[in-house]
Amino acid sequence: MTKVQYFTACTLDGYIADDRNSLDWLYEVPHGEEDSFWDDWFPTVGGLVMGATTYEWMLEHGGPDSWRKYYGERPGWIFTHRELPPILDVDIAFVQGDVLPVYEQAANRLGGANLWLVGGGDLVGQFHDAGLLDEIIVGMTPVTLGAGAPLLPRRITSKQLAFREAELIGQRIRIVLGVKR
């Protein structure tokens, strides 16, 4: 069964991007090179979902080749209410509306591989509201922004969340939480 996972980095005060939708703060923090989590986790991902702002940031900062560099040949579903530039020869669908039909399409296509919710937080919240979010994986950094795009702009209580793992890696703490559907 396809597992829906929100994997992102956030600041100590719970933001995934600053008030200009920038991730520059993230690259100032040393990455724990000794961490093998990504190498173990990423092969389980069959496809990606992201919002328009995340997609635009990726294009602006990495160019069209960044999709293949970061995600390989994995298909993507980009939620948007505006026209966005496609990336040639990359399997991307621009979608809008309810997350359930997109999840069903992705799950059927991925054949049991996991679906990575790249962001943003409100889109992830919509997956949660639809009962589709299975896991949250956060790399928390020792940075505060004071404002910006929140990690998950929803009230989700401990009745629905359970800590599974926490690990200090360099200057980051990785937290894995299970989400009850």
Regions found by a protein language model. Give the residues of each.
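Enzymes that bind and transform nitrogen-containing heteroaromatic metabolites
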Residues: 1-181
